[in-house]
Amino acid sequence: MLFSSDEALSFIFPCNQFGGQAPGSDAEIQEFCTLKYNTQFPQMKKSDVNGANELPLFTWLKAQKGFEGFGSSPAALMMKGMLAVSRPDYKSTPDIKWNFTKFVVDRAGNVAARFEPTADMKDVRKLVEKLIG
């Protein structure tokens, strides 16, 4: 865990909208995340993050921080290429583009940042450290 629970909270919202990467039950997904990523924070029920059935939380998060790009890393170039074929309009919508998109919300409830799955976790950690200062 990056931070103690009194400093920051992290939540996992499994979603099967991205290449069918989370087809299992909530229990199976939790076991996978615990074994593969050593997650030690709450996992919510599998949910939609885009579309007609998306959780209202994600409607709000995306309205606060829309998509700003993937950056220029090799992973970003791969993501851009994949989405250019499967979703040519991907740049023009606030939709979540792929699993592991992260939103940082400060203590006052403001969305401080959106990090795409291509973002370096060091950047996420740096922002959270600044916010919990």
Q: What is the predicted role of each segment?
A:
Residues 32, 38-118:
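Thiol/selenol-based redox catalytic cores and closely related redox-interacting motifs
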Residues 112-133:
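Non-catalytic, surface beta->alpha helical segment in thiol-disulfide oxidoreductase systems
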Residues 1-58:
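Structural microenvironment flanking redox-active thiols in thiol-disulfide oxidoreductases
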